[in-house]
Structure formats: structure tokens, C-alpha cells
Amino acid sequence: RDEFVVRACGVVAERGEGLKNPNIASGDVEIVVDNLEILNRAETLPIQPFAEDNQAGEELRFKYRYLDLRRPKMQNMLKKRAEMYRRIHEYMDGRDFIEIQTPILANSSPEGARDFLIPSRLQEGKFYALPQAPQQFKQLLMVGGVSRYYQLAACFRDEDPRADRLYGEFYQLDLEMSFAENGEEVRTEVEPLMKQLATDFAGKKLLDLSDLAVGDGSPIPRISY
């Protein structure tokens, strides 16, 4: 039965010719079982985590997210996300940026959206605000002698939902540089990283505009505003 947990005791042996299955991790071996015990039984699952086709609707998948995450596609996405984070750390560390986690509970610093407010248990009637961005903290770091800072920052913005997404919580590569002359210095600093991530993880060039294709050494076109 699907999802039953069993304990099989026996001898691991190589599968015979014609019995090997290259599509599974254990496809070259089998267990010659001496004893089989059911440790836990399971009811029929609301969604089938290993079936890529004919999946349940999105609402049901979100309700049983812990099962949906077991799908090979979702597992692959989690691994890609972790690898992307590793690449970002590697790139920024290699350019002498220092990773620093700034506080999550702080005073309000409006940045164009509404704050998520958290009531204080110790100070009645007062609230913490979840950061829309670490703006104030990273500027204080510059004053404190940290000339090149970065983090993969959690940002919280109480914005109205769009048709297909809610912006409430997201993560961004946040950075700050002391004595940067202009925004172009910052763009030039991170441009190679953006190209690398787009090429390696999306399998495509980041942008193709007016025959100027990113990925061939050309700079990303600048759009004024």
C-alpha cells in the first residue's frame, strides 16, 4: 500500500540481468527479505506526491503543501533555490562584501507600503514593525565601518494582492557600498551575477533588447526613468 512504513530485514544483493531499473536510485540492487514488518499504516492521500501528471488543483496542493513538496519537480526547485543562494554567497563573498543579518523586529520606517505591525508583550500599546527593507540598518553599518554589506533579506510589505500573487513576504539580495559615486557602480557590481543566475538557472539569456543579448559579454541595457 502507498505510504505504509515497513521494515525489511534481509540481504542486499545485486539484481539479476534484465531486472535492473535505471529510473530509480536502488535500481541495481534488491533486498532478499527474511522478515517484513509494518511499522505504520496510512490512509489514502489527498494528493499523490509522486504523480507528475493529473495533479490536484493549486488550492488543494497549497493546503497539503508538505505532500506537494515531495513531488520530484518541487524537490528539484528547492535544490535549485539552495544552489542559487550558494552562488550568490560565493559571488558576494568573493568581492569582499560582508554578510550581516539585520533585525527583523524594529521601529517603523515607511518605504512606500504599509507595515506589518507586531504588538509588544512587554510594552502595552506599542508595536514592532516588520522591515519593508533593511534600509536604515545598512546605512548605519556604513557609518560603523562596514563598507560593503549584503544579505539575502526577508522583506515584509502589507500591500494589496495582485490577481496572481501576494507581495506580503519576499526575499531579495540587499547590499550597500560606501563611497559609491552613483547607481551605475552598483549596477556594474551585480551585473555579472544577474547574468550568471539567469543563464544557469533559467536556461536563457537575461535580456534581449535591440539585438543586444546579455550573456555574450554585452552590458545589460540601461532604461532611464
Descriptions of predicted regions:
Residues 1-225:
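Class II aminoacyl-tRNA synthetase catalytic cores and aaRS-like
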